[in-house]
A protein has these predicted regions:
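Conserved ABC ATPase "signature" region
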Residues: 128-146, 403-421
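A short, surface-exposed alpha-helical micro-motif characterized by mixed small hydrophobic
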Residues: 215-217, 491-493
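Conserved ABC ATPase signature
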Residues: 150-154, 158, 425-429
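Conserved beta-strand-loop-alpha-helix hinge in the C-terminal portion
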Residues: 229-256, 505-528
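H-loop/switch region of ABC-family ATPase nucleotide-binding domains
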Residues: 209-210, 485-486
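Catalytic Walker B motif of ABC-type/P-loop ATPase nucleotide-binding domains
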Residues: 175-178, 450-453
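ABC ATPase nucleotide-binding domains
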Residues: 246-298, 521-547
């Protein structure tokens, strides 16, 4: 029997030399990195297109590659003096903690407290130490109010904070976070980054993130990864000199960086940028809105869990309208969509009414409702049932007897940037790519009312634009959309109507500019101000509703 290899906790957190990896032995490399290094206590931000290799790279640091995803055997990756390919995953997890994009794949236990305690318990720590770590992690992530809650009733954003607490309770030397705020509202995003700011200098942090405006204020380095290669690795202060490269790689450059370059100002000096915008009288153009069509769907939902009201709201959708629903995590946004589709857990009590084009579907089954509404939930992986991307997208087309299903499949593959992945297993793609597969599959059903839960989550700027153009093209063809999102910029640019939910109730509705500028949203917030929020710091007038 081979003697167990002791885990080293000293040395450089990450050192890469001559890394090449492909998911299939002998296949085309998806990652080629000549040299890369992360120093102790650094905060490294890894950015790039969806599917560009960011998650693959960090999975080489935490041992997921090659111990879970086999493929070719990557050499040249050393973490704290441990050769990753030769170090068992349980030993690596003692020094490297990982927060995944999708918290539902990471949260395993029935209650929040049990989940946070699970890791320390597996380290066989004394009971008092476990309690201490649980208390600290729950306090650090500000989830005290969730401590005794069942994990299955939590929103995606709440689950993400629970998953972060569970990782922090392990007290890893290095923390890897793969899109840690993808499902979190702006208020929760700010809380996460406040938590991470408190860890700076105490732990080494590696963050994969699309929300640059939130992360840039506290990172040390920015690493751009595209097509499996490190294109640049620079200090944060030099980022303003690489804006063209960021655009070319599908990165949504923070608004204040664009203004800073235009005015010749320091991008970190938000006050100076705002003052210049006000002095020059610059304003955002208001996009055209489509809100005068006939009502195609009336939906009411009242949902309770253990006597607590989760949702009590009615929303009407008009023909050729893109209606967005925003609000803080736990506001009832996703629960509303699930109620419309009759997808609720048995533990929840619900009353609902659904009328589509004059047809009362209040007592209709999921299957019957599916003939009128296409739905892509947050947990979209449950939709992916086929062996290849091509089969997944063509399934609905073939099922409804479309004679031109091959041509339509090709069209959707092209529209959603999936042509190069047509033969791939959907579940082996990145989160952003899988989400696009699910959306393409839903839209191929031909149903004219579509509900999308967080469609831009995990997407880079390039693919957000693709999704937006596809939605507007379909809107012109008579489609109507309800979109749950935390992406305020997406809402302002592309939606026609906005509903704000808070504690399950509608507190505000109107066009995006009406809502964002309304004093009812706890102060007047001009669109320019809204675009230029101080990175990482929620404005008090926006914090309550989580817009």
């Amino acid at each position: 029997m081979t003697e167990a290899v002791p885990i080293s906790t000293g040395g450089t957190p990450v050192e890469v030399k001559g890394l090449t990896y492909s998911y299939i032995e002998g296949g085309k490399p998806v990652l080629t990195v000549d040299s890369f290094r992360i120093e102790d206590g650094e905060v490294a931000l890894i950015i790039g297109k969806s599917g560009g290799g960011k998650s693959t790279l960090v999975n080489c640091f935490n041992g997921v590659i090659p111990h879970i995803f086999m493929g070719s055997n990557p050499t040249g990756v050393v973490v704290y003096g441990n050769v990753v390919k030769d170090t068992p995953l349980p030993k690596l997890s003692a020094v490297v903690g990982t927060l995944l994009q999708d918290p539902e794949t990471q949260v395993l236990n029935y209650t929040v407290e049990e989940e946070v305690a699970f890791g320390p318990e597996n380290l066989c720590l004394p009971t008092e130490e476990i309690r201490k770590r649980v208390d600290e992690a729950i306090a650090t992530t500000d989830i005290t109010s969730l401590r005794d809650r069942e994990t299955y009733v939590l929103s995606g954003g709440e689950l993400q904070r629970v998953a972060l607490a569970a990782v922090l309770a392990m007290k890893p030397k290095m923390l890897i976070m793969d899109e840690p705020t993808s499902n979190i509202d702006p208020e929760g995003t700010a809380r996460v980054f406040e938590t991470l700011t408190g860890l700076k200098g105490k732990s080494t942090l590696v963050i994969v993130e699309h929300k640059l405006e939130r992360a840039l204020h506290f990172v040390d380095r920015v690493v751009l990864v595209d097509q499996g290669k490190v294109l640049f690795d620079i200090e944060k202060g030099k980022l303003v000199d690489h804006l063209e490269e960021l655009h070319a790689s599908g990165i949504d450059v923070p608004e204040h960086y664009l203004w800073a370059k235009r005015f010749g100002l320091d991008p970190q000096n938000i006050d100076a940028i705002r003052a210049r915008i006000v002095a020059d009288g610059l304003k955002l153009e208001v996009p055209p809105r489509q809100n005068d069509g006939k009502v195609v769907m009336d939906a009411f939902a009242h949902v309770e869990a253990q006597g607590k009201t989760l949702v009590d709201a009615e929303i009407s959708l008009k023909e050729q309208q893109i209606l967005a629903i925003m609000g803080r995590n736990g506001a009832g946004k996703s629960t509303f969509l699930k109620t419309v589709m009759n997808f609720l857990d048995k533990e929840l009590t619900a009353r609902s009414k659904l009328v589509i084009n004059g047809v009362d579907l209040s007592k209709a089954s999921i299957q019957q409702r599916g003939k009128y509404i296409a739905y892509v939930p947050q947990s979209f992986d449950l939709m992916l049932i086929s062996k290849t991307v091509e089969e997944e997208i063509s399934y609905s087309l073939r099922k409804r007897g479309a004679k031109d299903y091959k041509e339509k499949t090709e069209e959707f593959l092209n529209l959603f940037g999936l042509k190069d992945f047509r033969r791939r297993d959907p579940l082996m793609l990145s989160v952003g790519q899988r989400r696009r597969v699910a959306m393409a599959s839903a839209l191929s059903s031909g149903v004219k009312i579509v509900m999308l839960d967080e469609p831009t989550s995990g997407q880079d700027f390039y693919h957000k634009e693709i999704i937006s153009k596809e939605l507007h093209m379909l809107k012109r063809l008579g489609y109507s959309f309800i979109i749950v999102t935390h992406d305020a910029k997406f809402v302002y640019r592309y939606s026609d109507y906005l509903v704000i939910l808070d504690s399950g109730k509608k507190i505000l509705e109107g066009t995006p500019e009406q809502v964002f500028e309304s004093s009812q949203l706890y102060s007047v917030v001009p669109p320019t101000e809204f675009y230029l929020r101080n990175p990482g710091i929620p404005l008090p007038e926006l914090s309550r509703a989580g817009v």
